[in-house]
Amino acid sequence: MSTYAFNRELRLLTPEHYQKVFQQAHSAGSPHLTIIARANNLSHPRLGLAVPKKQIKTAVGRNRFKRICRESFRLHQNQLANKDFVVIAKKSAQDLSNEELFNLLGKLWQRLSRPSRG
């Protein structure tokens, strides 16, 4: 049976983890956010979030964005490849409704989980 928990092992926790993702990564983006991914040697995907105060001004907005990203990742984790993902917010992300943001994330997860053609 699949589990949908979002445990500590499913998170990028240290600056070193984030740095590894930014090196030799591939990305999928939209006008509202970018997801950067890099393969890991683990048996599960991991998620990191980068939501700059400069992009989403209010704490409420940043927390909403992070909450929806975590929930989307939690529900899609069993279909995702074993990669480390970093979601980076852009200014226009605060204008999306919760449902629009959730649907956009679903499409980007799917795009990044496809096998590479190279």
Curated annotation (Swiss-Prot):
Name of one Pfam family that matches: Ribonuclease_P
NCBIfam families registered for this protein in UniProt: rnpA (TIGR00188)
Protein's gene: rnpA
Quaternary structure (record): Consists of a catalytic RNA component (M1 or rnpB) and a protein subunit.
Domain of life: Bacteria
Function of the molecule: RNaseP catalyzes the removal of the 5'-leader sequence from pre-tRNA to produce the mature 5'-terminus. It can also cleave other RNA substrates such as 4.5S RNA. The protein component plays an auxiliary but essential role in vivo by binding to the 5'-leader sequence and broadening the substrate specificity of the ribozyme.
PANTHER family hit by this protein: RIBONUCLEASE P PROTEIN COMPONENT
Organism whose genome encodes this protein: Vibrio cholerae serotype O1 (strain ATCC 39315 / El Tor Inaba N16961)
Gene3D superfamilies (UniProt xref): 3.30.230.10
Transmembrane stretches, start-end: none
Family matches, as InterPro entries: Ribosomal_Su5_D2-typ_SF (IPR020568), Ribsml_uS5_D2-typ_fold_subgr (IPR014721), RNase_P (IPR000100)
Reactions accelerated catalytically: Endonucleolytic cleavage of RNA, removing 5'-extranucleotides from tRNA precursor
Protein name, UniProt field: Ribonuclease P protein component
Top-level EC class: hydrolase
GO molecular function: 3'-tRNA processing endoribonuclease activity; ribonuclease P activity; tRNA binding
One GO cellular component term noted in the UniProt record for this chain: ribonuclease P complex
Keyword annotations of the record: Endonuclease, Hydrolase, Nuclease, RNA-binding, tRNA processing
Biological-process GO terms, alphabetical: tRNA 3'-end processing; tRNA 5'-leader removal
EC number in record: 3.1.26.5
Family: Belongs to the RnpA family.
